[in-house]
């Protein structure tokens, strides 16, 4: 059951722009899910995301195994002036389903 996804915002994105200039972020996310009986279980997923500088990205979690609803779990961004680091920001309000993020590196 794949209940996580990485979404990106490509508003005003120039499709002719070269993808080779984008950084790839290698990271693992451990999420906290609830079943119908509210028993928590954990899932760890590995991702590779293509990032653009100065954009905020969001990892979403599924509210429950039976639900189609999603909540924002954690936000991260890569800054144009330092492409070797990623800023991780927990969601300020609401349920935070993100237990842990392991950053393996940016290339």
Describe every region a protein language model picked out:
Residues 44-53:
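Short edge-strand/loop segments of extracellular domains
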Residues 23-33, 84-91:
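A short beta-strand element within beta-rich, extracytoplasmic domains
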């Amino acid at each position: 059951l794949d209940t996580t996804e990485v979404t990106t915002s490509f508003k005003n994105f120039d499709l002719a722009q070269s993808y080779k200039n984008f950084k790839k972020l290698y990271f693992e996310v451990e999420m906290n899910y609830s079943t119908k009986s509210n028993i928590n279980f954990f899932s760890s997923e590995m991702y590779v995301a293509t990032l653009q500088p100065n954009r905020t990205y969001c990892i979403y979690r599924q509210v429950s195994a039976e639900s189609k609803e999603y909540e924002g779990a954690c936000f991260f961004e890569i800054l144009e002036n330092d492409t070797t680091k990623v800023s991780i920001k927990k969601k300020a309000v609401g349920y935070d389903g993100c237990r842990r993020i392991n950053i393996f590196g940016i290339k």
